[in-house]
Amino acid sequence: MIEAPFYLFHHEVLWMSAANELPFSFPLPNSEILHRRAMVLSALCASDEGFCAVPVASIRKQTLAQMLRLYDQLFFSGFLCHAYGRIDVTLSQRLTSSAGKFMYARSGASRLSHAEIRMSGDFLFRLNKGPFLLNGLSVATPQEAFLVVFEHELCHAVENALFGSTGQSSRFLSLAHGLFGHTDTRHSLPTRMQEAASEGLSPGAKVCFCYQGGVLNGIVTYVGKTATVMVEDRGGAYRDRQGRRYTKYRVPLEHLTVQSEK
């Protein structure tokens, strides 16, 4: 029996009516998906203690490369390596708008000259205790969550290699479901802004922070990886409608103290 989320786009699998037309096994039984994902996770944790910690303490460049190599071998029979020649897997602390991103540049009419899967370090190192809901799957650990995000980017890579483009909604979901059991493309993880709001840090909040041996008081106007705080200052470059002047500071969230309303 076909699961309901998959049924909506099952007709799109007609473009691969015979599974043996693809250069890898498709679709995979759910038990096989779980087994292969567990093999990847076990191998990565065995070679990188920092990645195995909860929360994740660190991840080596070699671990990112090993992750791609294992997925290509276990799920794609080497197809990605053959199609692209090389895919760089990198970790970016500046990638905060998404948990991962697939990028490529073409050379000539069809051959792909360079491809990269950029994973968000900001996402990885904020994960703590599960369960986490990503792409329709519930996973227990930060490491599994990271793998599920990586699988999503791999689907972009394989769709692009097979069809010359990626992002065709129904086709992409068919691939993601058949390869990894994904039934959605969204996650329920809180954004930095939502996490900060739960601690009272949101635009309009009054805060204080230490600066050059003193304490400054201001108002939060934006929350991201850091907070933008406007501090009243007669010589400041910013002015409000009442004519008051301010200096703008970008402050790490952990350095801010929310001031209670009196």
Locations of the language-model features?
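Metalloprotease/metallohydrolase-associated module, dominated by Zn2+-dependent proteases
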Residues: 10-11, 28, 46-144, 161-262
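Active-site recognition of the HExxH zinc-binding catalytic motif
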Residues: 148-160
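Non-catalytic architectural context of zinc metalloproteases
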Residues: 2-47, 147, 256
